[in-house]
Amino acid sequence: MPPSLETIHSTTGPPAVELSGGIPSQAEAPGASPPAPSGLQPLGPSRKGAKDMVIERFEQKFIIHPRLVPQIRHYLEPFVVPDPNGKGDIPEYITTTLQLDRPTMDLALAKERKAYARFKLRIRTYGTDSNPKNPVFFELKRKVGVVIIKSRARMSRGKYGPNIVPHPETAPMLKSPKENNNLLEFCRIANTIGARPKMLIRYIRESYFGANDDYARITFDRRVSYRPTRSWELPGEEVADFKYWRPMDTQTGLRRPYAGYIFELKAMRDTPTWMMELVRRFNLNNTGFCKYAVAWRLETLFRGFTYADGSENTTLTPNWI
């Protein structure tokens, strides 16, 4: 049986904290060193000095009405450049994420419990092309207080398969030792806590980088959708039209009187002045919106659960998904 998440700790990255989202220790790997930065290939979010496999940053999320989007775009024009991975006059691409969790959904519940330190295990692709040369990213995203620390490993889609995480000894060698370390750490944590596929999340992302900043990102997410899964399969072109997905950016999902966009600001420790002015000018209110937690809440409602007393989520029974 996997160990309790209340009793496992981290010896790499942020300090160890006893809570529901704590990362398992690496005691079984004496002398192992924490992942270090390495070069990131162009596909996927990255820029300048932040082209690392380990990124530490701050994030702020906002739910905004669609009518604000053109106004914010206009404000941003002097400060940003389009994400080169985006297509069209408005730089957009599709992001698909496979979320891993324990049978009791502890990683999803860590958000509701407001755990000071928590983490997510996810496998991510960009676009809908199933070309075997396209990349798959294994991401460990940690949040300690307000700081986001993300490590990732890149593998070609043609080498990805259902045995990679359960049996990391079968994984191919990646382009750098640092990425190999990140992949092994991802698999170690997933297997220690018994995490397996639980949810697919897909959305269209409009993305920009700060034109003169070491690391600053602006994203607008729309058509945010999910579907439950128990499979390691990463969907591609066959579901590019969102036909088999359940919407999340609805009034119910966003808890707003309108269906809106998820607007996000990302920066290093020195937040650009133009970002702070944007928040002030448009009177934006920060929200702790988590796509995975919202998908979990909506799915429980879809299956007939009711809201728990004093909880923004729903009542839960083990292995519900």
Predicted regions and their residues:
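Phosphate-end processing signature that detects enzymes handling 5′-triphosphorylated RNA
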Residues: 1-321
